[in-house]
Design a protein with these regions (language model features):
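Cytosolic regulatory regions of ion transport systems
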Residues: 1-401
Length: 401
């Protein structure tokens, strides 16, 4: 059997190499100088031949025997590098099947149709279905058992957002009372006159020309106070809108209305694919992510509320409605962080969901860690995106020409 050349030995590339070697296929892997010694050792132990160098260089590809190989699999996380190498391989060796990793699924079909690439695949999209299936593997919690409602933490409110408007309303009401009794105005006229003074747009139909000195001084002070307080209120409103506070509150209110939803922690490529898949199935989703202005955040937000914050904090999980959710999916790119999120969610669930288990699904790169956790606990489902996607890459690479 002709060898398959794998370009890149990152976490995903190593999984592809091990899967190919497990199929009894000869493998040559091109690894650059940044590849860790551990990955090189694991690839060699699996039976792969290793060529050191940059897979974008023709001389390196020639040393790997790419022109005579069965297929070339481009596994790095750089879309540009993968596409550049794929096009060069198509020109150098048209008979070689090219299987390429790319992060934009909407472009993959164009690459296959226009450039003759055998398969352009997005690992996140390939694995999203497995995360969704794991999250939906238990019945929905439509009928929670009667219990004493838990005291949920409230979002802290900045004092100035309450004090300034209250002060403005207080001054406004006091001025109405003063003008009603001192000038003999009716209540509606006092309201009208106070409004014209505070906003400094008086029409002259009512004025303080013949009013007592004390009332005139009060009117002067009211004008200054009105201008100042209105300016401060306008600035606070601008801060409330422009800093994203209004959007955060809107998302939290949307999340508060949801029931039987799935909480997705981490809005990377996998998290976005999982949220998109769930939304497409009509399953309500709440996303937790620490980055507020990320492009993927803006892409996901119209479909589901995004809570900005650290998913390892119970207060953030409560804002996402963890006590009403059917499942939580932790899909960041860090195994330790995913485990911490899962443990925190389990603690919160035990405190706020009596008799209703929370399905916990965690993304995991380390197969040994997954085995250890599954050996001692059934509360957590660990899914390896790399392993699931690697099997698809291998299958496409070994398809008949």
């Amino acid at each position: 059997m002709q060898a398959v050349v794998v370009c890149g030995l990152g976490r995903f590339g190593l999984q592809v190499v091990e899967s190919l070697c497990g199929c009894g296929c000869g493998v040559t892997v091109i690894a650059d100088e940044r590849t860790t010694a551990e990955r090189l050792e694991r690839a060699a132990a699996a039976g792969a031949r290793i060529v050191r160098g940059d897979f974008r260089a023709r001389i390196t590809r020639a040393a790997a025997g790419l022109a005579d190989c069965r297929a070339a699999v481009l596994t790095t996380s750089s879309d540009v590098d993968n596409l550049e190498a794929a096009l060069e391989i198509r020109g150098e060796a048209p008979a070689v099947r090219v299987v390429m990793r790319h992060s934009q699924p909407q472009l993959c079909r164009r690459f296959e149709a226009d450039f003759g690439i055998a398969a352009a695949l997005t690992p996140a999209d390939l694995a999203a279905g497995a995360f969704v299936a794991a999250a939906l593997a238990v019945p929905s919690a439509a009928a929670p058992a009667a219990r004493r409602p838990a005291m949920l933490p409230r979002r802290p409110v900045r004092v100035e957002f309450i004090a300034i408007p209250l002060l403005l309303v207080g001054i406004y009401l006091a001025a109405i009372v003063v003008f009603h009794f001192s000038l003999g105005l009716s209540w509606i006229d006092a309201v009208y006159f106070t409004t014209t003074v505070v906003t400094t747009v008086g029409f002259g139909d009512i004025n303080l020309q013949h009013a007592p000195v004390a009332v005139k001084l009060f009117g002067v002070a009211l004008m200054f106070a009105g201008v100042l307080l209105i300016a401060i209120t306008a600035s606070l409103l601008a801060v409330f809108v422009l800093t994203g506070t209004a959007e955060k509150l809107r998302n939290e209110l949307r999340a508060r209305r949801l029931r039987d939803h799935v909480v997705v922690c981490g809005l990377g490529s996998v998290g976005t694919a999982v949220a998109r898949d769930l939304s497409g199935r009509g399953i309500p989703v709440v996303v937790i992510d620490p980055v507020a202005d990320d492009e993927m955040h803006r892409e996901t937000n119209p479909r589901c509320p995004v809570i900005v914050g650290d998913a390892t904090r119970p207060v953030i999980l409560h804002r996402a409605g963890i006590e009403r959710a059917r499942a939580l999916v932790a899909c960041t790119s860090n195994d330790a962080l995913n485990l911490e999120i899962g443990l925190t969610a389990q603690s919160v669930a035990e405190a706020s969901r009596s008799g209703r288990p929370l399905r916990l699904v965690m993304r995991c790169f380390d197969a040994d860690l997954a085995r250890r956790i599954h050996a001692v606990s059934d509360n957590y489902t660990l899914v390896s995106e790399a392993k699931i996607a690697a099997e698809v890459f291998v299958r496409r690479a070994l398809e008949p020409a």
